[in-house]
Amino acid sequence: VQGLKSKDIASVPAANAVDNLSGKLAGVYVTSGSSGPTASSNVTIRGQTSLNGNSQALFIVNGVPITNGLFSPGDGLNGSSTIDFGNGAQIINSFDIENISVLKGPAAAALYGSRAANGVIYVTTKTGKNSKGWGVSVNSNTVLETPLKLPNFQDQFGNGGGGKYSYNDGATYTGDYYDAFGENWGPRTDGQLVKVYNSNGDAVPFEAAPDNMRNFFQTGVSTNNNVSISHADENGDFRFSGTQLNRRGIVPNTDLNRNTLQTSMGKKLFNNRLEFRANAMYVGSGSDNVPNAGYDESSSVMYSFLWLPRNTPIDDLRDYWKPGQENVQQSYVEELWGNNPWLIVNENTNSFNASRLLGDINATYHINDRTNIRLRSGQDMKNDIRQYRRATSTKK
């Protein structure tokens, strides 16, 4: 059995508690998601052990098993959509962790059954036992993030086909005009004067816009604030904790807001021979928009960038509705396929509002110094409402 104490993760606790395990325990592998504020993290012990790809360890919080899997990833509208609303263990609050134990191999299955065949991550939350009278704790951290690495695009050629480009209407391909192509097989971007979709008939330089993707993404900010109150005496203890997490993603208009309330109460009776302990955790979380990490035309920003003409500056697309046709027809360099990236992040949103209640109660009777009897009951309940919006004129 390996383990981590609260001090091992207290310096910079991760917004997703699963990420606290990364690089700290032998044989424990954490694969962190990269799809935005709600991104899931996968945990395997001793590598992949299943041919069906399900090698995730079982998470147990104060004796209550919870699943770390994804529930219905996607938007239900397109099979190529991959929308990561977060993994089950994401609800665990890093500030409330007392210790984490890792059980490997047959020992885990022997204790917790077949669900633990891939190992167990056992999380014990904090109580008020270590308090001397009253105690108050305040914690806060802020983390900034930017894209680690962006794809390399060619900038020698721009919109068109067969080395040619001529503006028609962005929607009709007649064989003579190539502005309807969502590809970069046009002429070299040498600054020659051409008409484009938003130049109102005027000729503008045919030049590359190499920083489109960098100018589109923003600096992500994650702020995590926690306040806890605890008390202990010879008859029992209690602890109450409140945590607020606000995350802004690197993709514009993506976020995660999560509020966590956690309490633990203990009581000793009959000269400490009988002990009661109750733990409860409520998590309310939501997002106005979760980014699509898949290859889906209707809501994937990366899909749009792959087809965006290299001579079209991303800032020219900020006004994503055609004048006089707001909320009806998007404004984009081409109308045969592809969607304006700004339309995607502002109108084609994937939102959710979830609440989860996790709790347990146990009673322990100490017969003697070596023998005790324990009764335990636990409950894990979740309610999750999701909404997918797709604007009119969206290509799918």
Go through each PLM region and give its residues.
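Short, small/polar-rich motifs associated with maturation and membrane association
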Residues: V1-A278, L358-G359
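Short glycine-enriched loops at secondary-structure junctions
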Residues: D233, V328-Q329, D380-M381
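Extracellular/periplasm-exposed beta-strand and loop segments of Gram-negative cell-envelope proteins
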Residues: P151, N212-Q218, P291-A293, V333-N353, ...
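Conserved protein kinase catalytic core
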Residues: N68, A110-L111, S285-S287, D384
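Small-side-chain secondary-structure face that scaffolds active or pore-lining regions
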Residues: G249-Q262, R273, M281-V283, N289-G294, ...
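A surface-exposed, glycine/aromatic-enriched loop/edge motif typical of exported proteins
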Residues: L148-V194, V283-S331, Y388
